[in-house]
Amino acid sequence: MKKTIILIFFFSNLCLGQHQSAYKNGEWLNFKISYSGWIKAGKASLELNEDKSTGLYHVKAIGKTTGPIKWFFKVEDYYQSYFSSKSGLPKKFIRKINEGGHTKNLTIDFDQISNKA
């Protein structure tokens, strides 16, 4: 029983001591997308920036078709998300897509106080 209490106390302190964010300002990822490994199909990118004045992270995601695939099925997708750098709670989401003629523009504002989107 004594060992169990000591272990619980030890591990609870480890969890409380972690304050480091998983994100860093300026992080980005770029992807080249291919069909069967040799036909260029598209590209995608993710980018994260922190606005110190508002305390928000701004994430941009872009996906587009390239090469011969673009002639048959054109895709241009843009996503943006804003979320708190402290709590991780979302503030705003923007979606603007064009996938082969199917378009959708969507903006969602999140109000954490009234629990509404």
Task: Show where each model-derived region lies.
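Sec-dependent N-terminal signal peptides
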Residues: T4-N13
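N-terminal cleavable signal peptides for secretion/export
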Residues: L16-Q80, K86, F93-H102
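Solvent-exposed helix/loop surface patches that form functional interfaces
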Residues: K24-G26, T103-A117
